[in-house]
Amino acid sequence: MKDVDNLKSIKEEWVCETGSDNQPLGNNQQSNCEYFVDSLFEEAQKVSSKCVSPAEQKKQVDVNIKLWKNGFTVNDDFRSYSDGASQQFLNSIKKGELPSELQGIFDKEEVDVKVEDKKNEICLSTKPVFQPFSGQGHRLGSATPKIVSKAKNIEVENKNNLSAVPLNNLEPITNIQIWLANGKRIVQKFNITHRVSHIKDFIEKYQGSQRSPPFSLATALPVLRLLDETLTLEEADLQNAVIIQRLQKTASFRELSEH
């Protein structure tokens, strides 16, 4: 892969900022922003030449990055250019490396990062929605995810199972997106007073007779393991969150599955 020089002064070049969401940029800011996005997009094209041979190819998950005038999105999760974590994330992209944040989510399969240039447009939606990408882009390399995304439209199946969570209409309700280890997405309503353990119970009931190894839960982008299952969704700040099922491979499960 072609080596790419690091930015000499990332804070000086990272000028795609707005005083508040969706405010227009000044002429100087817009010019510098366009230069930065052009530079980043050009480097993404350069490093896209590295390919994986058919013998080495693994199952793939796509991550869609769009570079807007007022920030950038990762699978429609909006981020500011001025944030320190965002700067580190985009530095990795510019060097053709998979950001450590994505490495923490995907550790079994190949990640295909798509970079789209939308510097002349303002991103109006900042609602985080984790969804697959379909279309052309620039591959930055490979890594290993547990999630297998598909470019096809994903529809919610087994709707009868989705009614397993009792809701209190007198309390706030939130939508939780759940990505199962097999790549299937579920959207389920919960009260914010439900606990993390209720999400885990729901997944077990949803999968029903389909035997699966023990699993844990984590949020996506940024990665956060949900270790305390007694927390409510409000306490864990999981309103409208994206939850990932992460399988735990154990010998005891293999023994059980043989019976």
Swiss-Prot record:
The gene is UBXN2A. Residues 60-124 form the SEP domain. GO terms for molecular function: acetylcholine receptor binding; ubiquitin binding. Expressed in the colon (at protein level). Residues 167-259 are annotated as: Required for interaction with VCP. One of its GO terms (biological process) is membrane fusion. GO terms for cellular component: cis-Golgi network; cytoplasm; cytosol; dendrite; endoplasmic reticulum; Golgi apparatus; nucleus; perikaryon. Ubiquitinated. Pfam families: SEP (PF08059), UBX (PF00789). Part of a complex composed of STUB1/CHIP, VCP/p97, CHRNA3, and UBXN2A that modulates the ubiquitination and endoplasmic reticulum-associated degradation (ERAD) of CHRNA3. Within the complex UBXN2A acts as a scaffold protein required for the interaction of CHRNA3 with VCP/p97, this interaction also inhibits CHRNA3 ubiquitination by STUB1/CHIP and subsequently ERAD. Interacts (via SEP domain) with CHRNA3 and interacts (via UBX domain) with VCP/P97; these interactions are required for the interaction of CHRNA3 with the STUB1-VCP-UBXN2A complex. It is found in: Golgi apparatus; Endoplasmic reticulum; Perikaryon; Cell projection, Dendrite. Keywords: Cell projection, Cytoplasm, Endoplasmic reticulum, Golgi apparatus, Nucleus, Ubl conjugation. Acts as a tumor suppressor in cancer cells via stabilization of TP53 and subsequent promotion of TP53-mediated apoptosis. Acts as a tumor suppressor in colorectal cancer by repressing cell migration, growth, tumor dedifferentiation and cancer stem cell populations. May act as a biomarker of positive survival outcome in both colon and rectal adenocarcinoma patients. This is UBX domain-containing protein 2A. It comes from Homo sapiens (Human). PROSITE patterns: SEP (PS51399), UBX (PS50033). Residues 1-151 are annotated as: Required for interaction with CHRNA3.
